[in-house]
């Protein structure tokens, strides 16, 4: 049984400063910055960069001294945080993953633009795997998030 994977959407990299990381991921590697999303209630912000051929890197950085990104940086340092695979049917993927003995955590079907769950690193050789379902591109998804959940800004020349 194989999960209904549509694509490897992005790899998320935990960094202390998105601005400092841009010299590598934008200036040297040629990533095209998309929107910068801030999640104050969870203590982080994120910037996705798209690359030729469709690949993406999501830079995630803490907004302060608390939250999962800060905890990750304190214990592991900067580096790969998770990989996100887009799936055709999230509920089916969860059922199939569990049937295969994989530990699935954090199911969230509340946002119509982005539904997600995670495969525990205990089941994925130390890597967090995010499974997500969305039929919208990044810009369309951003319009559907409630304004109190995300503050959106463009990064032009950060």
Q: Where are the regions a protein language model picked out?
A:
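Regulatory and interaction patches adjacent to catalytic/ligand-binding sites
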Residues: 72
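An N-terminus-focused feature that recognizes amino-terminal "leader" regions
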Residues: 23-46, 99
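Short, structured motif recognition centered on aromatic/hydrophobic residues
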Residues: 8-15, 22-25, 49, 54-60, ...
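Short, flexible turn/loop "capping" segments at secondary-structure junctions
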Residues: 3-5, 75-76
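Vicinal oxygen chelate
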Residues: 1-4, 15-23, 28, 48-50, 57, 63, 75-158, ...
């Amino acid at each position: 049984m194989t999960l209904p994977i549509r694509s490897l959407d992005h790899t998320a990299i935990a960094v202390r400063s998105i601005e400092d990381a841009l010299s590598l991921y934008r200036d040297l590697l040629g990533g095209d910055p998309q929107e910068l999303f801030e999640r104050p209630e969870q203590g982080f912000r994120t910037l996705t960069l798209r690359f030729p051929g469709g690949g993406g890197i999501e830079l995630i950085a803490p907004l302060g001294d608390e939250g999962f990104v800060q905890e990750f940086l304190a214990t592991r340092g900067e580096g790969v945080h998770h990989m996100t695979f887009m799936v055709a049917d999230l509920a089916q993927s969860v059922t199939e993953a569990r049937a295969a003995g994989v530990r699935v955590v954090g199911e969230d079907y509340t946002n119509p633009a982005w539904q997600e769950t995670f495969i525990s690193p205990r089941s994925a050789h130390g890597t967090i795997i995010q499974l997500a379902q969305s039929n919208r591109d990044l810009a369309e998804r951003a319009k559907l998030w409630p304004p109190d959940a995300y503050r959106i800004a463009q990064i032009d020349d950060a």
